[in-house]
A protein has these predicted regions:
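Short, structured beta-strand segments at or near domain termini in extracellular proteins/domains
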Residues: 342-356
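Functional-site microenvironments in short loops/helix caps that host divalent-cation chemistry
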Residues: 28-33, 46, 52, 56-57, ...
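GGW-centered surface loops in extracellular recognition modules
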Residues: 37-40, 44
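C-terminal motif of bacterial Sec signal peptides marking the signal peptidase cleavage site
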Residues: 21-23
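Short capping motifs at secondary-structure boundaries
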Residues: 77, 92-101, 192, 355
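Short, conserved catalytic-motif segment at the N-terminal edge
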Residues: 51, 56-75, 165-168
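Short, solvent-exposed alpha-helical surface patches in non-cytosolic proteins
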Residues: 81, 86-93, 181-187, 203
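Bacterial N-terminal signal peptides that target proteins for export
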Residues: 2-10
Length: 357
């Protein structure tokens, strides 16, 4: 099975086209604080706790990057009940006149600095503002290692036009915003007095009141379709939509977890503040619980060594057990900081200290 279908976004997709055309940080002691104010609208409180982060022993889908499981302690925090929606992001843009990465002119000189020396410049017709979208018209896949068969660089695709010119978010206020890069998410957080969750915080929230669960509802994989928006059928050519959705779903379309959080698994991937390092867990000192971990000190992905990646969590509507199986709490992948797509969004967190300012 291949587990890297979303590893590269714009940069990697363009690089593939070029080739085709040319032949613990844990510095602050945790107190698992319980001092809190009234929950902000649209957020819930996650109690500080010590829990097992990473792949559970019974998880047959677990990847090496999710191991070994290890004890971590996180302080309490607030987290959004849902992924940030189109309506919420629109309010931010209207208040700030912010322009997302997908809407900006592509800077080839900046991009070139992140590529192997000698990489030829793509044609100007390709270097246009846009984003990656899933190619729903893919009919056959010759080689599952070539993800460009089901991903398309769509000029004009962005958060306002998720499938390119002619598409719209009109009537979709309560759908998760997509085509947002890390920079876009951080700008929203600054405006809203929020921040992105750490990977440990994200897992603590996804676990809710459970302990050692693989999924947000427990360990029963047979009820996946009733609890998360994922791919059913044959990936990537046939989606039988047994869960009622072919692609992205409105937030709150599935049952919440035990503390009232929706869509922590499936629908869209969610950005975190942690840098992605494929061997991060293996490098940790696990003799005692790690206090408020903030992720790896540097980014490293052997399949994308030239760019910085952040951890994204939760999987998306494209996840299928034959390909990525990332509809699990411990699952994670890396995403480049300038990348967006039609299956990645984010949710935010806040601490009592942040809200008191």
């Amino acid at each position: 099975m291949l587990h890297h279908f979303k590893k590269y976004i714009l940069f990697s997709f363009l690089l593939s086209l070029i080739f085709l055309l040319y032949d613990c940080k844990s510095d602050t002691p945790a107190t698992t604080n319980t001092i809190k104010t009234e929950a902000p609208k649209g957020m819930v409180w996650v109690e500080g706790k010590t829990f097992l982060q990473g792949a559970k022993a019974s998880d047959k889908y677990a990847m090496p990057r999710e191991k070994p499981a290890h004890q971590v302690t996180v302080d309490g925090f607030y987290i959004d009940v849902t992924e940030v929606t189109n309506a919420q992001f629109k309010a931010f843009v209207e208040a700030t006149n912010y322009v997302t990465v997908a809407e900006r002119k592509i800077d080839w000189e900046k991009m070139k600095s992140q590529l192997p020396a000698g990489t030829p410049k793509p044609h100007d017709s390709i270097l246009q503002p846009g984003s990656l979208i899933f190619n729903k018209n893919v009919n056959a896949v010759v080689n599952m290692n070539n993800y460009t068969q089901w991903w398309t660089w769509k000029i004009g695709a962005n958060w306002r036009h998720p499938y390119g010119p002619g598409s719209s978010i009109e009537g979709k206020d309560n759908y998760p915003v997509v085509h947002v890069a890390l920079e876009d998410a951080l700008a929203y957080c600054k405006w809203a007095n929020r921040r992105l969750p750490t990977e440990a915080e994200w897992e603590a929230a996804a676990q809710g009141n459970q302990t050692d669960a693989i999924f947000t509802w427990g360990n029963d994989a047979t009820i996946l379709n009733a609890n998360a928006n994922t791919w059913q059928g044959v990936f990537p050519t046939k989606n039988e939509s047994k869960d009622g959705f072919e692609f992205i779903a409105e937030v709150k379309s599935y049952p919440p977890n035990s503390i009232g959080l929706y869509d922590m698994l499936g629908n869209v991937w969610e950005l975190t503040s942690d840098l992605f390092h494929v061997n991060y867990y293996k490098q940790l000192d696990t003799t005692s619980p790690i206090l408020n971990p903030k992720g790896a000190a540097k980014s490293y992905s052997p399949s994308n060594p030239y760019q910085v990646e952040h951890v994204m969590k939760g999987g998306s509507f494209l996840c299928h057990d034959s390909y990525c199986a990332s509809f699990r709490i411990s699952a994670k992948m890396g995403v480049t900081v300038d990348s967006g797509s039609d299956h990645m969004g984010f949710r935010t967190v806040a601490t009592p200290e942040m809200l008191s300012k």
